[in-house]
From Swiss-Prot:
Lineage: Eukaryota, Fungi, Dikarya, Ascomycota, Taphrinomycotina
Pathway: Amino-acid biosynthesis; L-phenylalanine biosynthesis; phenylpyruvate from prephenate: step 1/1
Biological source species: Schizosaccharomyces pombe (strain 972 / ATCC 24843) (Fission yeast)
Family from the record: Belongs to the PHA2 family.
Annotated GO CC locations: cytoplasm; cytosol; nucleus
Gene3D superfamilies cross-referenced by the UniProt entry: 3.30.70.260, Periplasmic binding protein-like II
InterPro entries: ACT-like_dom_sf, ACT_dom, Preph_deHydtase
Record-given protein name: Putative prephenate dehydratase
Length: 272
């Protein structure tokens, strides 16, 4: 049997690369240029799995990832992976920095170091931290640096100037491990954490949904709200929760205009 394939946001050296290695160490790695390309490869079954960052412990929800998950019922969350997000500065010199390149999430996770050391530098957002490092490594003027991972610097032999510039030394990014195909209701019980996605046309319906959760002691661990783009001021809700049971799926769904059970997986976070 051939090895499974797992897609991640590349190039190699990104935190997504690290997540893929942790999630599926025996799978063949497939580096892709964007989150959209990662999900397209998964839904078209070019790969068997994908990792997608959804939350950082310092900077919160990864909004572009959630927006790509809106309305999808063709993929399933089957795991979560926590990746330590230790950031480094890559470049020629810190003496005359005019531009600092990175993924937008990294800027938010390293704001204290940036303010203290390169407060006047222009932020330039690129698709990944590894792409930022590759671009900065080509600069011959000494005016451009990048925020990236140490793995990226080591793998590509880039010049590493400063290590561990993240605001919080415990900074971590949480990834979902996804596989193709929607949720299949077999006889096995749900795992401890579940991901739900639902659309509500009126805010009063949210109270009804939460009443079901409360009555059955379902604990909400994460709630992300995004514009539905169907009608103004209506929303799609992404809910991660502990204690969801199969008999509650229909009970919650009856209050929702659309409802998708996006999978269940082992919880990797200690909340209590």
């Amino acid at each position: 049997m051939s090895a499974s394939k797992i897609a991640f946001l590349g190039p190699r050296g990104t935190f997504s690369h690290q997540a893929a290695l942790l999630a599926r160490p025996d799978s063949l790695l497939c580096s892709l240029p964007s989150f959209a390309a990662v999900l397209e490869a998964l839904s078209s079954r070019q790969v068997d799995y994908a990792v997608l960052p959804i939350e950082n412990s310092t900077n919160g929800a990864v909004i572009p990832a959630y927006d790509l998950l809106k309305g999808r019922d063709d993929i399933q969350a089957v795991g979560e992976v926590l990746v330590p997000a230790h950031h480094c500065i890559i470049g020629k010199s810190l003496e005359n920095v005019q531009k600092i390149l990175s993924h937008p999430q990294a800027f938010g996770q390293c704001s204290k170091w940036i303010s203290a050391n390169v407060p006047n530098a222009e932020f330039v957002s690129v698709s990944s931290t590894s792409q930022a490092a590759a671009l900065a490594s080509k600069d011959i003027t000494g005016t451009i640096v990048a925020i990236s991972s140490e793995l990226c610097a080591v793998e590509n032999q880039f010049n590493l100037l400063v290590k561990n510039i993240e605001d919080d030394s415990n900074n971590r990014t949480r990834f979902l491990l996804l596989r193709s195909g929607g949720f299949q209701d077999d006889l096995s019980p749900l795992k401890e954490k579940s991901l739900l996605q639902f659309y509500l046309s009126h805010p009063k319906k949210l109270s009804a949904v939460f009443e079901v959760f409360a009555a059955h002691k379902v604990v909400i661990t994460n709630l992300v709200v995004r514009p539905s783009c169907k009608f103004p001021w209506t929303y799609i809700y992404f809910v991660e929760c502990l204690g969801m049971e199969k008999h509650l799926i229909d009970r919650v769904g009856k209050y929702c205009d659309t409802f998708t059970f996006m999978g269940s997986y082992t919880n990797q976070i200690s909340y209590f």
